[in-house]
Amino acid sequence: TAGEISNITRTTAGATNQAFIDICDAAYWKVRTGAQSYTAAMLEGVKALGQLQPIVRYPSGHKDTLEVAVLRSIRTGVAQSSGNMTIQQCKDMGWNHVLVSQHLGARVSDTDPIADHAGWQGKVYCIDGKDAQFDNLLDATGYPENPLGLCGYNCCHSFTPFLPGVSQNHNKPIDTEANRRAYEL
């Protein structure tokens, strides 16, 4: 790419962490193309970074170990690019709805509905606008603008095209207390 695509993982690591950004971008491409698993790419990235810096410092002052920072960066980058491709696929098909995945142990927030992944997971949303049956994707999940929401920092959720009247949501409600317990482990 001759330097045209950089910081694809959109890490917020500071400018002093350019090596971290470069290594995360390389790991992202290895995972995204199927050349390596998340774990293999993370381990390779950690090994390379271990030669350069022991921890990653973010502009917020937050610090992470290399393993955590690299894996989070790869996961976030893959989720964001997958989300962008799904939105484009929906546009190409003329569809305006998506179904968000769900999992036990989804992030919980009692103060921010966007950061409360447990609250919006497993549901169908409108990409543009909203209708009588489904809420707006951006308003409900923060996608693609809020880094605390869907496909944001360390988010494991994905979403797929959904056509009301044809597609079906087979997600079963997850008990909120069971989810909270799993999240807090």
What do these predicted regions represent?
Residues T1-L150, F162-L185:
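Domain-core detector
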Residues H157:
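Catalytic core of tubulin tyrosine ligase-like
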Residues N154:
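Extracellular structured ligand-interaction cores
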